[in-house]
Amino acid sequence: MEIDKELTPKQIVEELNKYIVGQYEAKKAVAVALRNRWRRQKLPEDLRDEVIPKNILMIGPTGVGKTEIARRLANLVKAPFIKVEATKFTEVGYVGRDVESIIRELVDVSFKMVKAEKMEEVREKAKAIAEEKILDYLVPKKPKRYGTLIEEEEESPAREKFREMLKNGQLDDKVVEIDVEEKVSAVVGGVVVPGLEDIESQLKELFSNLGPSKRKKRRLTVKEALKIIENEEAEKLIDMDEVQTLAVKRAENLGIVFIDEIDKVAARGSSKSGPDVSREGVQRDLLPIVEGTVVSTKYGPVKTDHILFIAAGAFHLAKPSDLIPELQGRFPIRVELKALTKDDFVKILTEPKNALIKQYIALMSTEGVELEFTEDAIQEIAQIAEEVNERTENIGARRLHTILERIMEDYSFNAPDLKGQKIVIDSKLVREKLGNVITNEDLTRYIL
């Protein structure tokens, strides 16, 4: 569970640079916060508990990389990560979600991560057992007298032949009938009631623990059956109590909670009436879990003292100082993310590992179509994105998705008929596709 000591703050920023353009201050802040976790683990136990994480408040318009920075950071260190929106929560007693469900969901994520890792450790053993079970369905072992099974070394040549065929994938499409565990569902009438997700998961847990698990027969291909049996066997081989313990520890020490739209629950100005009272109620409910408390979960009690909280908001109408003082004090690190410029858009289109241009080229290549964006086309797209963001709502890099979809719409639709062809997107074509939309203010507002 220890954080990799090789990841220095500089290396963390370099890793984030592969996916996110600019925003150096924000990257630096999260890199230091992450490194401090590793430093804390090296301290003597009595001092370790005293060192609490420095939570971060990110301030900046939508689409500039706030969420992406936090998500990539969590992936980097295999930390449990959850993103929640502050507006989805209401103060206790009103319709809405209970803030403690944030921690319950975080531990769920942690549990799934640890379980997947442990199952991977026993994957080879589970695969061997699954293969034997599939062979039992295909070529049942011959019973000896008095019903005892023949020894392994005496198994029939047919079974040995089938084993080879199974390993080589020659039986993948053959259909077999197998017994599988029946999953219990506790959904009532398909109705989702806000705030009752936790009760539903607890009901599922309760029903699944009542008596032996039911099994039902299913007809599947050998490939599908192998996967299902392999997962069932892997679950039997791992110690679920150990998984739960590790999941709680990982959530407590490595968990990252990203609270988006925190500005929407800030009271605006000096007024404290109407909706502002409810907003303050949400902040006061968030305060205990950010300060450090113990939350009961189905995996056991979870201490929130060392969970890293990253809050974010555009703060167009409210200011960070409009948050209640106690909550402000729990987010000592403030970073402002800059609005994106034309140069940033050019980099976003081309530089990251998952750059949008690379994505479109890869998607079209699946249809046998070669796609190329010229340098002047990329400059033109970036220029248009900047202009539209200035004239209408500033939605940051998300504007590029809208513009590129508009440009690629016809090509994507006709791609199966364009196999073997090369499409070159230049600035002239970009202007043709977007010309009328850009010049007409009303169309821009609705289409881009």
Swiss-Prot record:
<dbReference type="GO" id="GO:0016887">
    <property type="term" value="F:ATP hydrolysis activity"/>
</dbReference>
<dbReference type="Pfam" id="PF07724">
    <property type="entry name" value="AAA_2"/>
</dbReference>
<dbReference type="InterPro" id="IPR050052">
    <property type="entry name" value="ATP-dep_Clp_protease_ClpX"/>
</dbReference>
<dbReference type="GO" id="GO:0036402">
    <property type="term" value="F:proteasome-activating activity"/>
</dbReference>
<keyword id="KW-0143">Chaperone</keyword>
<comment type="subunit">
    <text>A double ring-shaped homohexamer of HslV is capped on each side by a ring-shaped HslU homohexamer. The assembly of the HslU/HslV complex is dependent on binding of ATP.</text>
</comment>
<dbReference type="GO" id="GO:0043335">
    <property type="term" value="P:protein unfolding"/>
</dbReference>
<feature type="binding site">
    <location>
        <begin position="63"/>
        <end position="68"/>
    </location>
    <ligand>
        <name>ATP</name>
    </ligand>
</feature>
<feature type="binding site">
    <location>
        <position position="21"/>
    </location>
    <ligand>
        <name>ATP</name>
    </ligand>
</feature>
<dbReference type="GO" id="GO:0008233">
    <property type="term" value="F:peptidase activity"/>
</dbReference>
<dbReference type="InterPro" id="IPR027417">
    <property type="entry name" value="P-loop_NTPase"/>
</dbReference>
<keyword id="KW-0547">Nucleotide-binding</keyword>
<protein>
    <recommendedName>
        <fullName>ATP-dependent protease ATPase subunit HslU</fullName>
    </recommendedName>
</protein>
<keyword id="KW-0067">ATP-binding</keyword>
<dbReference type="Pfam" id="PF00004">
    <property type="entry name" value="AAA"/>
</dbReference>
<dbReference type="InterPro" id="IPR004491">
    <property type="entry name" value="HslU"/>
</dbReference>
<comment type="similarity">
    <text>Belongs to the ClpX chaperone family. HslU subfamily.</text>
</comment>
<dbReference type="GO" id="GO:0009376">
    <property type="term" value="C:HslUV protease complex"/>
</dbReference>
<dbReference type="InterPro" id="IPR019489">
    <property type="entry name" value="Clp_ATPase_C"/>
</dbReference>
<dbReference type="InterPro" id="IPR003593">
    <property type="entry name" value="AAA+_ATPase"/>
</dbReference>
<dbReference type="GO" id="GO:0005524">
    <property type="term" value="F:ATP binding"/>
</dbReference>
<comment type="function">
    <text>ATPase subunit of a proteasome-like degradation complex; this subunit has chaperone activity. The binding of ATP and its subsequent hydrolysis by HslU are essential for unfolding of protein substrates subsequently hydrolyzed by HslV. HslU recognizes the N-terminal part of its protein substrates and unfolds these before they are guided to HslV for hydrolysis.</text>
</comment>
<dbReference type="GO" id="GO:0051603">
    <property type="term" value="P:proteolysis involved in protein catabolic process"/>
</dbReference>
<feature type="binding site">
    <location>
        <position position="326"/>
    </location>
    <ligand>
        <name>ATP</name>
    </ligand>
</feature>
<dbReference type="InterPro" id="IPR003959">
    <property type="entry name" value="ATPase_AAA_core"/>
</dbReference>
<keyword id="KW-0963">Cytoplasm</keyword>
<feature type="binding site">
    <location>
        <position position="260"/>
    </location>
    <ligand>
        <name>ATP</name>
    </ligand>
</feature>
<keyword id="KW-0346">Stress response</keyword>
<feature type="binding site">
    <location>
        <position position="398"/>
    </location>
    <ligand>
        <name>ATP</name>
    </ligand>
</feature>
